[in-house]
C-alpha cells in the first residue's frame, strides 16, 4: 500500500524527534566565577597555623558548576570550589539565594557544593568555632565572596542550559598521591587489603560535557589527593595542585587543544593574540627604551576587569578537578623525612626523635613547593586530557537525587556482634583526640603531641579541662580516643563543632555521586562505594549494573573533619583522632547511605531530618579592618618602587620583577579582575594583556614594611613561560587605596618596558 507524502513526512518528523531525544537526552550547562577573596591579612584555612597569613596571590580561586537536567524532569547541580572545604553556613545562604531566584528548582536535595581541599585559601567562612579560631573569628569578606561566587556559577550554568550529552571515562593515575598514614592502613584486615593493589585509590573518574551544537563545554573529574602541595608557611592564595590542574586544562582547551602538555610548556591560550615581532634584539630594545615606567594614576574601578586576560563575556570551557576520599592521601610523594637529620621519620608515629614538628613530607619538586604544585597538578591535568579525549561511554538514564540531615552526635547504628548476630550502638558527640594536635606529615602540629597516641598525658588533660571536661559517657563512647577537645559539647560562645550533617546521592544515568561532609580515608571510601554499588545492583539489577560508576565527592555541603575505618580509628593517628563521632562513624555513614539508596531506587521521599543551625548572627570577628593607606611624601599609589633593569632582556624561564607602592588588597578584592597584568606591545603601539594573576607563571606579592604601617608595596614576579612570544613587554599593577575618611580609590601603574627573546 502506498504511503502518502504528508504521512511519510509526519512519520519522518516523529523519528527525528525521537532520535534527537535519544541522542541528547539531557540539558547541560556549566559556569565559573571568581572566589579568590581577601589576599591580605586573613589567616589561611587548612593547616590551622595562626602565622599563615595571606599576602598575595599565586593564582586565582574559582567556583565551577555544572547542571544536568532532564528536559521535563529532574535536575542536579554540582559546584566544585577552589576552597578548603564546603561550609554549612555558606550552603544555607546559597540555597536561600537560589530559592529567591528560582523557587523550588534548586534545593538542598539536588545541589551539591564541594571543596578541593586547598590549604592556601582565605579562612573565616565557616560557622563553627573550631574552624575559625586561627582566622580570629568570622571573616565577612571571605564568606561573601564564596557565597556570591557559588551563586553566580550556578546562574551561569542555568542560563547556559542546552541539549547535550555527558560521557564518562576512568583510568589510573599512579604517581600523584601516597598514603601518609600507612601504619593505620595496615590495621585494616589483611583479607580486605589483599583485594587492592595500592594503599591509596589511583582511579580518576571524569565526566565530559558536550553541547549538541557547540561541542565540548567542560569536564569534571574526581580523584583523591590532598591539597597540600603548598606548605603551611606559604602565604600566597593558591588552588594548590587541583586548582592548577583546572587552570592548565581550561587554557589547554581554549588554546585549541594544540599546545604540548609537557612540563616545560604549560598551556597558554593568549600567546596567539600577540604579533610575532622581529627577532632583532637591538630593534626590540630600541622600542622598549621609549616606554618608561608610568607614574601611578587614578583609574576606573572596572578597568582591572576589562584588561584581564580571560574575558568573562566569552563562553567558557569549564574544567573542575574535584576531591574524593583523600583523608590519608598526600601529594608529597617522595616520602617523609626529618628536617634535622634528613633520615626517614618514625613509621608508626611520624616523629623524629619523638618530635612531630621535625617530620615533613616531600613533594616531587622538593624543596620548591610551587614546583611540587605544578608537577602534581600537571599529572592530574594530563590524566584528565587522556580521559577526556577517549571518553565514549555515554551517560544514559534517569536523573535522580536523595538527601537527608542526620544528627551524628546520637545516631543508632546496627553493627555485627563478635559471636554472631547484631547489636545497636550509638555515635558520639564530636570530639578530637590527642593525635589531632600532632598534625600530619603534610603539616605537623606543635608541642609534644604525636600521631598514634591512644593514651594522652596528664598536663594536656589539665589544659583541656579548663575548656571542658568530658563526662564518663563521652569518654567511654569515644574510646580508644583520648579526648583532647570535647568540641561537640562545647557551646560557648556558640557551637564548636557540627552535630547535624547532610548526606546526599546524585544520579546521572549510570553515574552515582555520594556527597559526604568530610574526608574519608582510602579504605573508608572503598567500603562506602562498594557497599552502595552492591546495594543498588541487588535492589534493582535492571536499573543498576556492574557498569555503573560510583564516586565519592568529599568535603561536600558542610565539613566534619575525617572518617576513618573502625580499625584505623583504633590506631589513633591523625585521621582516626579527627574522626569526630566515634569508632562507628563509618558504619553509620554506610547504614544511612543505604537508606538514601533505597529511596533512590523506589522513588521515595525521605523525611528531611533535623535542620542544621544558622549561626550567622552569632559570629564574632576580631580581624581589624583596613584603617588607612598611605605613601611616602611625593609618591603616588601605583608608582614604581623597584623597576625592571634598564634596557633589560629576558629569556624564557627567567624571572622578571617589579615593585609598586600599593594599598591593601582588602580594599578591593578585584573579583573577576586582576591585581597584576603582563602586557605586550602590539603593532600600532597598543598594549595588550597576555598574563595576569590567574596565571601559574605570575605571582602577586603584597607586604607592609612594618606590621602596623599604613604603607605597603606590591611585588609582581613573572617567570617567562616557554610559550611566551618574543617581543616588548611591561608589568602593570592595579590596586585600591583607602583614605582616612573611608573612601576607596582605584589606581594603576606600570613598569618600564623590557624585551623577551
Curated annotation (Swiss-Prot):
UniProt-listed GO biological process terms: ceramide catabolic process
Glycosylation: residue positions: 311, 348, 657
One GO MF term: N-acylsphingosine amidohydrolase activity
InterPro entries registered for this protein in UniProt: Ceramidase_alk, NCDase_C_sf, NEUT/ALK_ceramidase_C, NEUT/ALK_ceramidase_N
Keywords, comma-separated and alphabetical: Endoplasmic reticulum, Glycoprotein, Golgi apparatus, Hydrolase, Lipid metabolism, Secreted, Signal, Sphingolipid metabolism
Signal sequence residues: 1-25
GO CC entries: endoplasmic reticulum; extracellular region; Golgi apparatus; membrane; plasmodesma
Active site per UniProt: 330
Localization in the cell: Secreted; Endoplasmic reticulum; Golgi apparatus
Reaction(s) catalysed by this chain's protein: an N-acylsphing-4-enine + H2O = sphing-4-enine + a fatty acid
E.C. number: 3.5.1.23
Lineage top rank: taxon: Eukaryota
Family per record: Belongs to the neutral ceramidase family.
Function: Hydrolyzes the sphingolipid ceramide into sphingosine and free fatty acid.
Name recorded for this polypeptide: Neutral ceramidase 2
Organism: Arabidopsis thaliana (Mouse-ear cress)
Amino acid at each position: 500500500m502506498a504511503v502518502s507524502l504528508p504521512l511519510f513526512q509526519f512519520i519522518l518528523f516523529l523519528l527525528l524527534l525521537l532520535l534527537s531525544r535519544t541522542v541528547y537526552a539531557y540539558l547541560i550547562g556549566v559556569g565559573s566565577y571568581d572566589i579568590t577573596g581577601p589576599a591580605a591579612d586573613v589567616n589561611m584555612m587548612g593547616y590551622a597555623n595562626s602565622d599563615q597569613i595571606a599576602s598575595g596571590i599565586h593564582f586565582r580561586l574559582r567556583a565551577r558548576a555544572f547542571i544536568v537536567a532532564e528536559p521535563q524532569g529532574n535536575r542536579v547541580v554540582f559546584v566544585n570550589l577552589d576552597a578548603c572545604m564546603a561550609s554549612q553556613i555558606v550552603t544555607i545562604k546559597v540555597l536561600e539565594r537560589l530559592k529567591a531566584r528560582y523557587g523550588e528548582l534548586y534545593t538542598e536535595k539536588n545541589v551539591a557544593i564541594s571543596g578541593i581541599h586547598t590549604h592556601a585559601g582565605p579562612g573565616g567562612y565557616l560557622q563553627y568555632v573550631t574552624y575559625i579560631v586561627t582566622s580570629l573569628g568570622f571573616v565577612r569578606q571571605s564568606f561573601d565572596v564564596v557565597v556570591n561566587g557559588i551563586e553566580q556559577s550556578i546562574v551561569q550554568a542555568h542560563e547556559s542550559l542546552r541539549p547535550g550529552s555527558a560521557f564518562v571515562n576512568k583510568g589510573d593515575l599512579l604517581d600523584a598521591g601516597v598514603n601518609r598514614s600507612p601504619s593505620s592502613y595496615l590495621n585494616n584486615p589483611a583479607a580486605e587489603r589483599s583485594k587492592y593493589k595500592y594503599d591509596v585509590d589511583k582511579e580518576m573518574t571524569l565526566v565530559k560535557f558536550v553541547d549538541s551544537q557547540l561541542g565540548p563545554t567542560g569536564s569534571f573529574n574526581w580523584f583523591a589527593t590532598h591539597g597540600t602541595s603548598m606548605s603551611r608557611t606559604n602565604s600566597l592564595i593558591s588552588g594548590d595542585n587541583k586548582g592548577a590542574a583546572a587552570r592548565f586544562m581550561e587554557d589547554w582547551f581554549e588554546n585549541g587543544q594544540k599546545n604540548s602538555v609537557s612540563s616545560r610548556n604549560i598551556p597558554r591560550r593568549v600567546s596567539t593574540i600577540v604579533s610575532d615581532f622581529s627577532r632583532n634584539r637591538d630593534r626590540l630594545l630600541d622600542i622598549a627604551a621609549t616606554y618608561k615606567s608610568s607614574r601611578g594614576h587614578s583609574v576606573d574601578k572596572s578597568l582591572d576587569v576589562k584588561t584581564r586576560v580571560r574575558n568573562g563575556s566569552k563562553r567558557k570551557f569549564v574544567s573542575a578537578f574535584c576531591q574524593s576520599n583523600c583523608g590519608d592521601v598526600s601529594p608529597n610523594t617522595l616520602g617523609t623525612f626529618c628536617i634535622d637529620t634528613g633520615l626517614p621519620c618514625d613509621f608508626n608515629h611520624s616523629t623524629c626523635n619523638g618530635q612531630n614538628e621535625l617530620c615533613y613530607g616531600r613533594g616531587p619538586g622538593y624543596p620548591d613547593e610551587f614546583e611540587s604544585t605544578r608537577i602534581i597538578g600537571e599529572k592530574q591535568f594530563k590524566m584528565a586530557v587522556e580521559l577526556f579525549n577517549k571518553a565514549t561511554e555515554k551517560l544514559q538514564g534517569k536523573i535522580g537525587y536523595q538527601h537527608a540531615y542526620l544528627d551524628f552526635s546520637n545516631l543508632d547504628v546496627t553493627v555485627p556482634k563478635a559471636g554472631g548476630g547484631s547489636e545497636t550502638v550509638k555515635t558520639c558527640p564530636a570530639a578530637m583526640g590527642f593525635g589531632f594536635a600532632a598534625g600530619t606529615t603534610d603539616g605537623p602540629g606543635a608541642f609534644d603531641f604525636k600521631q598514634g597516641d591512644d593514651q594522652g598525658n596528664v598536663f594536656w588533660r589539665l589544659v583541656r579541662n579548663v575548656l571542658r571536661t568530658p563526662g564518663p559517657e563521652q569518654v567511654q563512647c569515644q574510646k580508644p580516643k583520648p579526648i583532647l577537645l570535647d568540641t561537640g559539647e562545647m557551646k560557648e560562645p556558640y557551637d564548636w563543632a557540627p552535630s547535624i550533617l547532610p548526606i546526599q546521592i546524585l544520579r546521572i544515568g549510570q553515574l552515582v555521586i555520594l556527597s559526604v561532609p568530610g574526608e574519608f580515608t582510602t579504605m573508608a571510601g572503598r567500603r562506602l562505594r562498594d557497599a552502595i554499588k552492591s546495594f543498588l545492583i541487588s535492589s534493582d539489577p535492571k536499573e543498576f549494573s556492574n557498569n555503573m560508576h560510583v564516586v565519592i565527592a568529599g568535603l561536600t555541603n558542610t565539613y566534619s573533619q575525617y572518617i576513618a575505618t573502625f580499625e584505623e580509628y583504633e590506631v589513633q593517628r591523625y585521621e582516626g583522632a579527627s574522626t569526630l563521632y566515634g569508632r562507628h562513624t563509618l558504619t553509620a555513614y554506610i547504614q544511612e547511605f543505604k537508606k538514601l539508596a533505597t529511596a533512590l531506587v523506589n522513588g521515595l521521599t525521605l523525611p528531611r531530618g533535623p535542620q542544621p543551625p544558622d549561626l550567622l548572627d552569632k559570629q564574632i570577628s576580631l580581624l581589624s579592618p583596613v584603617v588607612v593607606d598611605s605613601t611616602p611624601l611625593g609618591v603616588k599609589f601605583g608608582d614604581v618602587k623597584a623597576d625592571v633593569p634598564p634596557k633589560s632582556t629576558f629569556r624564557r624561564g627567567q624571572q622578571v620583577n617589579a615593585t609598586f607602592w600599593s594599598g591593601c588588597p582588602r580594599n578591593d578584592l578585584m573579583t573577576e579582575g586582576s591585581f597584576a597584568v603582563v602586557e605586550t606591545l602590539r603593532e600600532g603601539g597598543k598594549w595588550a594583556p597576555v598574563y595576569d594573576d590567574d596565571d601559574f607563571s605570575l605571582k602577586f606579592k603584597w607586604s607592609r614594611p612594618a606590621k602596623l604601617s599604613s604603607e605597603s608595596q606590591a611585588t609582581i614576579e613573572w617567570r617567562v613561560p616557554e610559550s611566551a612570544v618574543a617581543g616588548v613587554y611591561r608589568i602593570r599593577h592595579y590596586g585600591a587605596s583607602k583614605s582616612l575618611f573611608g573612601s576607596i580609590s582605584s589606581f594603576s601603574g606600570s613598569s618600564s618596558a623590557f624585551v623577551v627573546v
